[in-house]
Amino acid sequence: MIFNPLEQFRISVLQKLFFGNIDISITNNTIILFVILIGFTFLFYVNYSTNTYIPSKWQYAVENIYLFVLQLFKQQINNIVALKYFPLVLFVFSFILFANLIGLLPYGFTITGHIIFTFQIAFSLFFGITLINFFNNKTEFFNLFVPSGVPKPLIPFLVVIEVVSYLIRPFSLSVRLFANMLAGHTLLNILSAFIFNVFKKYALISFLPLLFIVFIIVLEFCIAIVQAYIFSILTCIYLNDIYNTSH
């Protein structure tokens, strides 16, 4: 049997379902998606429904996530009116974090390792924020594409550059998350297969590569958190354009 490190990213159909001509089959991707949504929703619900004077470990962990994202939000958007968008950023951070971490579990499936999934999230945020920005600011929205203090002859060229850089936001946001998750999990899979072969042939020295793979797992854990953090920061930056349309 040929070893394929990308096998872990294959979407497998578990139950074929059709609604007319529309394929709504249940896949491993679907199952993991529901596990993530139910998991972190249950975690937040239990935390706030069983709130006690002395917080439990779960309460302490969830409250720290909440405060961490709130601090991140306030650092990027210095506008009290914008706090109504904080739940969105908290959801984005929590969802991406859970999606990244669940892929590190045995037999886990990394949905953020698929460009179509990360692009759907990034484009939905980009499209929604753009609409809100346009309806809130009307014609002032277009100030985003006209840098202030620029000589008039250069404005047409800079407008083109600004428009292109604005339109590629969902692509850069989705590719960054997808590429990191794909590369990290592929490397982890390759090293795991290598260590398994070393263990079969040279059991006495197998602890050396084993220590290395433990280091890689810890590194992947950190990358999963960092990618959720970066995704949330960029979401905040895009939201900040609603209240700051001038360069």
UniProtKB/Swiss-Prot annotation:
The keyword Transmembrane helix belongs to this UniProt entry's keyword annotation: yes
Topological type in the membrane: Multi-pass membrane protein
Gene Ontology cellular-component annotations: mitochondrial inner membrane; proton-transporting ATP synthase complex
CDD domains, per database record: ATP-synt_Fo_a_6
Keyword Transmembrane part of the UniProt annotation: yes
SUPFAM superfamilies registered for this protein in UniProt: F1F0 ATP synthase subunit A (SSF81336)
PROSITE patterns: ATPASE_A (PS00449)
Function comment: Mitochondrial membrane ATP synthase (F(1)F(0) ATP synthase or Complex V) produces ATP from ADP in the presence of a proton gradient across the membrane which is generated by electron transport complexes of the respiratory chain. F-type ATPases consist of two structural domains, F(1) - containing the extramembraneous catalytic core and F(0) - containing the membrane proton channel, linked together by a central stalk and a peripheral stalk. During catalysis, ATP synthesis in the catalytic domain of F(1) is coupled via a rotary mechanism of the central stalk subunits to proton translocation.
Subunit and interaction comment: F-type ATPases have 2 components, CF(1) - the catalytic core - and CF(0) - the membrane proton channel. CF(1) has five subunits: alpha(3), beta(3), gamma(1), delta(1), epsilon(1). CF(0) has three main subunits: a, b and c.
Name of the protein in its database record: ATP synthase subunit a
Originating organism: Acanthamoeba castellanii
Gene that this sequence comes from: ATP6
